[in-house]
A protein has these predicted regions:
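Amphipathic alpha-helical hairpins
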Residues: 1-117
Length: 117
């Protein structure tokens, strides 16, 4: 299975959207609200998601032959982050979880693909 340029561009955009949503939610909501929003494991997952999305987008933008591996890893991280956000609950966390799930779905598909020759 090969990817096309548009599929990759869409995945890159999903990664950037997820990264932005997680970063804004973490800094503009979680750190303001406190409590369960700033529990160590949740904050680490959000930071992991921010970094994984950035890395996957960077690999795809460069056309790295290893982008499928980073996309597969990004999908796993995004799923874990979405689950954590859903456990916390609330409208902001729901939006973040939705962005994570969209990115995970896109990255999971990209992770299954091989670069066209």
């Amino acid at each position: 299975m090969h990817h096309n340029h548009q599929e990759m561009q869409d995945c890159i955009q999903q990664c950037w959207d997820c990264r932005t949503e997680c970063q804004e939610t973490l800094f503009n909501h979680c750190l303001e609200v406190g409590g369960k929003h700033v529990e160590k494991e949740h904050v680490k997952l959000m930071m992991d998601c921010i970094q994984a999305c950035q890395t996957a987008a960077d690999f795809m933008t460069r056309g790295s032959a290893l982008h499928t591996s980073t996309c597969a890893a990004c999908a796993d991280v995004c799923e874990a982050c979405a689950e954590s956000c859903e456990r916390i609950g609330g409208e902001e966390m729901k939006r973040c979880a939705e962005a994570c799930r969209r990115c995970a779905e896109s990255c999971r598909e990209m992770g299954k693909m091989k670069k066209a020759a």
